[in-house]
From Swiss-Prot:
Gene Ontology terms: biological process: nuclear protein quality control by the ubiquitin-proteasome system; proteasome localization; protein transport
Role this protein plays: Involved in ubiquitin-mediated protein degradation. Regulatory factor in the ubiquitin/proteasome pathway that controls the turnover of proteasome substrates. Targets proteasomes to the nucleus and facilitates the degradation of nuclear proteins.
One family name in Pfam for this protein: Cut8
GO cellular component, one term: nuclear membrane
Region of interest: Disordered: 51-75, 300-326
UniProt-annotated location(s): Cytoplasm; Nucleus
Protein family per UniProt: Belongs to the cut8/STS1 family.
Subunit structure and binding partners: Binds the proteasome.
Underlying gene: STS1
Keywords: Cytoplasm, Nucleus, Protein transport, Transport
Protein name, as recorded: Tethering factor for nuclear proteasome STS1
A Gene Ontology molecular function term of the record: proteasome binding
Length: 326
């Protein structure tokens, strides 16, 4: 037992370190402290030699290089919390169909309608059926024709002579599209205001008077062939006059009661016939025959005379046909 104790040592047996071990640890700790102190002193000397202070450098980086005067902010009585801005999600959109149609101009609506009929030909019949139900007044037709006539006059090229009855070939080339547009529109309007489209023959006479007056006052050209479209339109108007006069001849009441008015129409037709160089001769003769019949209506045999007149004029315009629009 004694030998074992001497070999192992009392400190080891009971968990205590010997004095030699304690002294060695103290020496090591002291040596480490000295080494750390010497290292810190070396770093301090090195930094001082370079003129740099770690703490001061840190402060200089935090502070602005150019100090600016700070604005005094008045203290707030109440702290207001900042809210995130609310952005609206509503975006623009085009007008509804019915609202857009209300705001469209006549030209815009006409353009869209024509485009629809071009792309969908089946819609043309639908539009045509709707147009049949409409009754356009003579005043509207007159406004439309005056617009076309204004465009025709604006297309006349400048001329020093200002002679609109002897225009040149160059003027005809410039004016031809407007001439055709005006004449076609004129014939279309007249055809819409004669029987059986309308029952009032006075309206038919009124629009015939208006359109004939317009055609006779159109600017003409020095070369006779350039006036072909005018003469062709006057021939169509002559056929239309004859058609309306036939309906008047069948209307006994109008022939008797409106005799003075019919005579007034005869005087106008005579003037138009002179201006167009006799193209309206046939309808003028028909109208004059009605005036002769009207003079014999006062007799007791007025009924027979009227029937004879109606038989005489039925089919009197068989040789007249409304030509195609050029």
């Amino acid at each position: 037992m004694e030998n074992n104790t001497a070999v192992l040592g009392a400190g080891f047996s009971w968990g205590f370190k010997s004095d030699n071990v304690m002294k060695c640890q103290e020496q090591e700790e002291q040596q480490a402290r000295e080494n750390e102190k010497s290292l810190n002193s070396m770093v301090a000397n090195l930094v001082q030699a370079q003129g740099m202070d770690p703490k001061g450098r840190k402060r200089r980086l935090d502070e602005p290089t150019n100090p600016q005067p700070q604005m005094m902010v008045p203290p707030r009585k109440y702290n207001v919390s900042k809210r995130r801005p609310h952005h609206s999600t509503i975006s623009g959109q085009p007008l509804p169909l019915h609202r857009g149609l209300e705001l469209m101009s006549k030209d815009q609506l006409q353009y869209i309608l024509i485009e629809v009929m071009k792309n969908y030909p089946i819609s043309q019949q639908l539009v045509q059926n709707k147009l049949v139900d409409f009754n356009f007044s003579i005043e509207k037709c007159e406004i439309l024709l005056k617009e076309k006539l204004q465009q025709l006059h604006e297309s006349i090229p400048y001329s020093r002579s200002h002679d609109y009855q002897r225009l040149s070939d160059y003027a005809f080339v410039r004016m031809k599209p407007h001439i055709l547009e005006f004449l076609n529109c004129l014939v279309d309007c007249v055809l819409d205001r004669i029987p059986p489209r309308v029952d009032n023959l006075h309206e038919s006479l009124k629009i015939l008077d208006m359109t004939t007056d317009m055609v006779t006052k159109l600017p003409r050209f020095q070369l006779a062939s350039n006036n072909y479209y005018y003469d062709k339109c006057l021939e169509q108007l002559a056929c239309l006059w004859c058609t309306v006069i036939e309906h008047i001849a069948r209307d006994v009441i109008m022939t008797v009661n409106d005799a003075p008015l019919l005579r007034n129409w005869i005087q106008k037709l005579e003037l138009y016939n002179e201006l167009c160089h006799g193209i309206l001769t046939k309808p003028l003769n028909q109208f004059k025959s009605l005036a002769v019949v009207d003079a014999g209506v006062t007799d007791s045999n007025s009924t027979k005379g009227t029937n004879a007149t109606r038989n005489r004029w039925s089919g009197s315009t068989d040789n007249y046909t409304v030509g195609d629009n050029q």
